[in-house]
Amino acid sequence: METLKSNKARLEYLINDMHRERNDNDVLVMPSSFEDLWELYRGLANVRPALPVSDEYLAVQDAMLSDLNRQHVTDLKDLKPIKGDNIFVWQGDITTLKIDAIVNAANSRFLGCMQANHDCIDNIIHTKAGVQVRLDCAEIIRQQGRNEGVGKAKITRGYNLSAKYIIHTVGPQIRRLPVSKMNQDLLAKCYLSCLKLADQHSLNHVAFCCISTGVFAFPQDEAAEIAVRTVESYLKETNSTLKVVFNVFTDKDLQLYKEAFNRDAE
């Protein structure tokens, strides 16, 4: 039973537990500030393999993450649509969205980013959702017997996020320009796979991050055009009632999505 009363105490417990688990000779120096404790915790959680954890660890982790995540929640009901009543563009932290599902830009290993404190969306989503997501993803890979293919989609619970579910997809990685037709089609397939999976699970709404535009280096302008075109075509052709949020983080992406919708309206 989780009895720790503060998130700082919970962080210290989780850090100590992961440090003991590593079974190395490094001396653990516990930081004094919450921010430094969080960075140490996050780094340890990021690099931790997909191994079982104790019920006590889960209880402490869940109490802490759910409390921290509750402090910053963005409800879909408060967003203003950019087209019709079912398509939105929103700038902010996707992990704060209270929504049926958010989309995670995963890599082919499918275990979440394992680089300590890396600021990619894969890292942030796994960190804020909890260790259970990595364990679920590891089980998916174990069952299918191979790494995840580009353009496919899988779903896990959201655990400690405000989102009920996470849809994971692996986008194409761009190594040279111009972007090939194959990679354009693969990016479109990512969006289609996520939309189909959302409808198969009878979800009401889904939020997309900007798939492949980070370390996978897909040009942001092309990616925005493909995302908007693919989602609009799917909704029209299938008569899906899904509400779709295009989540952007940078000012540049916000402008690119607005421009894409403006061109679409012309």
Swiss-Prot record:
Keywords: Glycosidase, Hydrolase, Metal-binding, Zinc
Enzyme class: hydrolase
Catalysed reactions, as listed in the record: 4-O-(ADP-D-ribosyl)-L-aspartyl-[protein] + H2O = L-aspartyl-[protein] + ADP-D-ribose + H(+)
SUPFAM superfamilies: Macro domain-like (SSF52949)
Cofactor list: Zn(2+)
Positions that bind ADP-D-ribose: 93-94, 107, 120-122, 212-214, 216
GO MF annotation: an example: hydrolase activity, acting on glycosyl bonds
Signal peptide (residue range): none
UniProt cofactor note: Binds 1 Zn(2+) ion per subunit.
Coiled coil regions in record: none
Binding locations of Zn(2+): 113, 118, 120
Macro domain mapped to chain residues: 74-265
CDD domains: Macro_OAADPr_deacetylase
EC code: 3.2.1.-
Summary of the function given for this chain in its UniProt record: ADP-ribosylhydrolase that specifically reverses the SirTM-mediated mono-ADP-ribosylation at an asparatate residue of GcvH-L, by releasing ADP-ribose from the target protein. May play a role in the regulation of the response to host-induced oxidative stress.
Membership in a protein family: Belongs to the MacroD-type family. Zn-Macro subfamily.
Name used for this protein in its record: Protein-ADP-ribose hydrolase
Organism the protein comes from: Staphylococcus aureus (strain COL)
